[in-house]
A protein has these predicted regions:
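A structured beta-alpha segment of the ubiquitous adenosine-cofactor-binding alpha/beta core
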Residues: 65-73, 78-81, 85, 96-108
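Generic hydrophobic/aromatic pocket-lining and core-packing "Φ" positions
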Residues: 20-21
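N-terminal glycine-rich dinucleotide-binding loop that anchors FAD/FMN and/or NAD(P) in oxidoreductases
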Residues: 44-79
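Generic structural signal for well-ordered, non-membrane alpha-helical segments
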Residues: 13-16, 53-60, 106, 110
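Beta1/beta-strand and adjacent pyrophosphate-binding region of the FAD-binding site
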Residues: 1-15, 31
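Short, structured interface segments
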Residues: 1, 94-95
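Iron-sulfur cluster-binding cysteine motifs and their immediate structural context
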Residues: 24-38, 42, 72, 85-94, ...
């Protein structure tokens, strides 16, 4: 079995986002798997962060945008790790993706799909 030198980050909260960006900026290809429809985790629900009371969205939003735009990151939102096989340095991971009902590569964030469903 050939070795595919890539990294899997499970969880798209602020820690997973930071890990994915750090690894991608170091030249690794990163697969970021998040079980919810969007990344951001609990931090996306907060107004301010502790202990500095910095604006949570001001920290998180640029990082979320950077994940989507980074050529070394493949984002699989609304997905879960179903199985892990292999050995150290050569794993095979099965990811189960939930249906999105949109073509993600064509999405420009216009929210017209939400209007169609409401």
């Amino acid at each position: 079995m050939p070795i595919h030198a890539a990294v899997l980050v499970v969880g798209g909260g602020i820690a997973g986002i930071d890990a994915a960006l750090t690894l991608a900026n170091a030249g690794k290809h990163v697969y970021l798997v998040e079980r919810e429809p969007t990344i951001g985790g609990h931090m996306a629900q907060f107004d301010k962060t502790f202990p500095t009371l910095d604006c949570a969205a001001c920290i998180l939003t640029p990082k979320m945008t950077a994940v989507r735009a980074h050529p070394n990151i493949t984002l699989w939102s609304y997905s879960e790790v179903a199985a892990v096989d292999g050995y150290v340095g050569n794993y095979k991971v099965t990811v189960r993706r939930k249906p999105r009902y949109i073509i993600e590569d064509l999405c420009v964030g216009c929210l017209a799909c939400i209007d169609a469903c409401v």
